[in-house]
Amino acid sequence: MVSLLKSLSYSIKYNKSIYPSIEKKFKEYRTYTKRIRKLSVKATAREALDKSRFDAAVSSICLLYDKTNTELAAEVLFSFDAIVQYLNSICLRSYTGTEPFLKLIFSSLRDALNLRTDAYENYFTFFPSKDDDGYLTILVEKCRQKVLLLPSYNVIRDHLAAFISLFIDLQVTKFSSDDNAKEVNLINWSTAHGQKYPELSCWEYCMAVDSNLSIRLLLAMATDPELSEQKAENLNSAFFPWICCIHKILEGYINYNDDLFSGNINYDFYYENLKEYENRIIFFMDRALKFKTGQWSHTRMAAKLLLGIYITHPKASEGMNGITSKALLKAGGRGMFFYTWALKLLRSKIYL
């Protein structure tokens, strides 16, 4: 009964508050893509924006906590997700994966999160077309404007700076490495940075950082004017690395066939079989729920919703993925039926 009530509560909140905020920002950002003259860059921007809708659904699990300002948090997270997805799409489609290029365009994330006070740079200096007609700069400024409204920004700033530095460093390592050196470079990177988490494989540490759910959680929590450093630390310890790892396993599973065909990095390739990453999801959920804070039930709900969002994705029922989805549903434990039911209802109304 508790799971039913919570799933209904989430469904109503998503329908009434989160979805309208996402759609408002989506339509606003869609108009900005019209300024991009180069057709290939415009197509990349619009495709990335479409993907940001699903990212926003994933980010919604960060909006469950008490005293979160849902409307402000949804807008901040969509703005951040839109930049990350745009940068990722550019990198996947660009042959200019040099370190100077990658460091420069990913520095836009620091500007978007108000982590440096320098004037914005020409992020596309090393890009073949030299410019996207200011589209990325607009995204950065729109995100920064929302970040400046966060009442508890100073509480999360140091954590935010640390996580964004790791995230950028990983992206530069991942996208600047050629196919032959990529695995070795990522292993070396993880070995150098992930020593604090011996329970994780090198690929799982990369997963946790690549997820950036920890960054989204911090931004959402900062909408709470009464946020304490202790509360921020406790909640973030549940998300990073545990729920972040669950996120990337699930993302990898729905993109498995696409990435196999395209040659994109997919961390699920490094698990031996379905049973192994099913067991790892259970392990990560157990670790996340070890943190018995006042928000424990919200964290449990966030983990189950995250599973449900991916299990109900259209790709989750394609081919062998149907078997995987049933196993992941079981891994989610009691109450998963109600969460997946609520999410399927949202999908049927094109809210998700």
Regions inferred by a protein language model and the residue ranges of each:
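Internal amphipathic alpha-helical repeat/solenoid segments
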Residues: L63-L64
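All-alpha helical catalytic cores of prenyl diphosphate-utilizing isoprenoid enzymes
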Residues: Y19-S60, A73-A74, I105-Y253, N257, ...
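Extreme N-terminal leader/anchor segments
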Residues: M1-S11
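Post-HEXXH active-site segment of zinc metalloproteases
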Residues: T98-R110, N266-Y267
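Active-site/pore-lining binding-face segments in mid-to-C-terminal subdomains
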Residues: K231-L306
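Alpha-helix boundary/capping segments in eukaryotic regulatory proteins
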Residues: T68-L72, I90-G97
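Acidic, carboxylate-rich catalytic segments that either coordinate divalent cations
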Residues: G308-L352
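Acidic (Asp/Glu-rich) catalytic motifs at the cytosolic membrane interface
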Residues: F80-S94, H247-D258
